[in-house]
């Protein structure tokens, strides 16, 4: 059945001078099957509960984000990395709904778990902003930075599609940014969660598109 919402979301074209690539929370705490959440699940004897998440990260997200980073760097386009985690050893700066997981996986600044995956590591001079909430708009200088760049189009990648990615993208849309969830650049705990977040986002909030299409549209393929 056709969704009536489509008529209210006419879409937009990406422009290289106005766009930034946003890499969300691709850290050892949440994006590695060997550290952080992956290690916790293994130690608990239930690694299969993370299998779908980490299989997609390893086989789809990392290669996709690597291609996007390479293209954006080659064309000197804007890149910003977001991380999530505590700035304090007692995790007291995190809201109650985020603190238990951060504590369980050791996600605090200065620990390996807080670092971005080596395969996606930022280069010198690239922006890395930490947040202590799911949305970067509430606990970092993200909005101030991208507005200073003259950016009003944002390409979102990373984890998890249904939490920090969608949370930041929703807030961006409410602030007038034109947003794209890069479908093959995002992932969640399950395909169902990822697909639901993508479906919901594209109804009224922005676009959901493939990395190949956005790079072609930007002339950066």
Range-by-range predicted roles:
Residues 1-20, 34-38, 66-75, 86-90, ...:
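Active-site-adjacent betaalpha module
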Residues 22-24:
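Short hydrophobic beta-strand that contains or immediately precedes a catalytic carboxylate
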Residues 26-34:
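Short acidic, Gly/Ser-rich segments with clustered Asp/Glu that frequently serve as metal-coordination loops
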Residues 30, 51-57, 155:
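Surface-exposed cleft-lining segments at the edges of enzyme active sites
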Residues 34-54:
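A solvent-exposed, charged loop/short amphipathic helix patch at secondary-structure junctions
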Residues 52, 56-59, 104-108:
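Short coil/turn segments at secondary-structure boundaries
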Residues 55-66, 118:
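Alpha-helix-centered segments that form part of catalytic cores
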Residues 80-85:
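A basic- and aromatic-enriched beta-loop-alpha substructure that forms the phosphate/nucleotide-
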């Amino acid at each position: 059945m056709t969704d009536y919402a489509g008529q209210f979301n006419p879409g937009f074209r990406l422009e290289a001078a106005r766009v930034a690539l946003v890499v969300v929370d691709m850290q050892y705490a949440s994006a590695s099957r060997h550290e952080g959440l992956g290690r916790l699940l293994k130690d608990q004897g239930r690694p299969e509960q993370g299998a779908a998440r980490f299989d997609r990260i390893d086989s789809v997200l990392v290669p996709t984000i690597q291609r996007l980073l390479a293209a954006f760097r080659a064309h000197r386009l804007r890149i910003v990395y977001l991380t999530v985690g505590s700035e304090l050893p007692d995790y007291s700066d995190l809201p109650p709904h985020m603190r238990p997981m951060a504590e369980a996986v050791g996600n605090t600044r200065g620990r390996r778990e807080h670092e971005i995956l080596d395969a996606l590591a930022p280069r010198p001079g690239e922006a890395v902003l930490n947040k202590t909430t799911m949305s970067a708009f509430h606990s970092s200088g993200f909005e101030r930075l991208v507005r200073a760049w003259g950016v009003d189009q944002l390409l979102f990648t990373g984890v998890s599609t249904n939490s920090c990615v969608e949370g930041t993208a929703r807030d961006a849309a409410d602030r007038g940014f034109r947003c794209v969830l890069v479908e093959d650049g995002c992932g969640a705990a399950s395909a169902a969660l990822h697909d639901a977040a993508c479906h919901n986002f594209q109804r009224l909030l922005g676009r959901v598109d493939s990395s190949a299409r956005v790079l072609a549209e930007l002339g950066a393929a």
